[in-house]
Structures are given as C-alpha cells and as structure tokens.
Amino acid sequence: MQEIIASVDHIKFDLEIAVEQQLGAQPLPFPGMDKSGAAVCEFFLKAACGKGGMCPFRHISGEKTVVCKHWLRGLCKKGDQCEFLHEYDMTKMPECYFYSKFGECSNKECPFLHIDPESKIKDCPWYDRGFCKHGPLCRHRHTRRVICVNYLVGFCPEGPSCKFMHPRFELPMGTTEQPPLPQQTQPPTKRAPQVIGVMQSQNSSAGNRGPRPLEQVTCYKCGEKGHYANRCTKGHLAFLSGQ
C-alpha cells in the first residue's frame, strides 16, 4: 500500500550515490592487507578500478564455487588473488574429510558438506559398452538399462531425451589406460681404448684387494701394531697408561 500511495523508488539519496561511486574511500596504507570484511569493488566488476592493490574493497575475479578452508581459519594470505571463495556460504563449503573418508562425522554442527558416497560413483564405461571384466568388484556403477532399438538400427528421433539407453562404444582414455610410449633404443656407445684400460685396471685392483697384513694394522685402543682393536687384550684405556 505504501508503494502505491507514496512510492520512493525514483528517489535516490545522496548516501546511496556515495556508496555506489565509493566517494571518500581512501587507499590502503600498503598492498596485501586483509579485506575479507570489506565490500566488493563495483568499479573492478566493470574493469574500471585504477587503485589496483591499494583499493580498500575486494577484487573478485571469476566464479568461485568452493569456500577457502584457510580463510575460515583466518590463515589465507592470498587475499583477492585466492582462487577460492572468501565468503561464508553453506552451499559452497568444501567436502568434510571425515565423512568422505570414514562415512561418518561426529561433529553435529559440522560446517562442511556431507556428500553421499553413492552420488560420487560414476557409471562404468566398460559396462555401458557391453562387458566389464571386474564384474561386481568394479568400483564404478553397473546400471542395467534397456537399449534403444532405433539407436542400434542407426538413428533415434528422440535424441538425448530418449528414455532408453544409447550405448557408447568409445572409451575414455585415462591416465592408467594410456598405451605405453615406445622406448627409444639407442646404439651402444663406443668407449675409447684409454678409458677401457683405466676401468679394467681399476676393476682388477679392486678385485685383488684383500685384507691388509697384521704388520700394517695399528690398534686404536693401545696404539700398537700387529692386531685389530677387537682382538686387543689391554683394554680401551691402555693408551692413557702407556701399558
């Protein structure tokens, strides 16, 4: 009734004009400050903001579908450059880790999304093609459908809206199903005769190396020659007494 008798839709207050044009908005002291509680910059949405990183309002670019989990804890350092949403929206919260991992969550007021595991299972492309070797152990969904006879003949007038199944004979090429790349066979490289001689001499010297004679062995416990430290009978403090 008030809109009929005295409509004020055509009246625009000075405060509304000041808010739309961001009059009196001072630039930030330094870039990179937290602007999570500020409003969205209207000029940035129109690609007309000249303040850049010093703008006191938020610069939101693109469609962000998931809330930033670090912003919820006040730990996000990316600010407007974050690829996730800095806004508390229950419909865009990330998935609950405990519910997705264990199938249950003990927090009755959990702010994260509890997604049904059945809804995340995709249809098996092999089963839709006709046969899946994994059978009931397949991690994908096996759904029985009635094949469209018209589609098998060659053409279905219903198209995608047909209530029967239109089988797809092509398979998605996953990362694990890609054919192995052919390995390049390189011819054996020929080594110089000098290098071969050095390597043979090193191998022969290493193969002929045996235990050193006891005359060259010095015991680190007593300091005498002729036996190893594990065979010393004078004790580990014999070098202090000079015995």
UniProtKB/Swiss-Prot annotation:
Location(s) in or outside the cell: Nucleus
Keywords: Metal-binding, mRNA processing, Nucleus, Phosphoprotein, Repeat, RNA-binding, Zinc, Zinc-finger
One GO term of the biological process aspect: mRNA processing
Cellular component terms (Gene Ontology): mRNA cleavage and polyadenylation specificity factor complex
Residues with Phosphoserine modification: S241
Domain of life: Eukaryota
SS bond list: none
Name this polypeptide is given: Cleavage and polyadenylation specificity factor subunit 4
Lineage, opening ranks: Eukaryota, Metazoa, Chordata, Craniata, Vertebrata
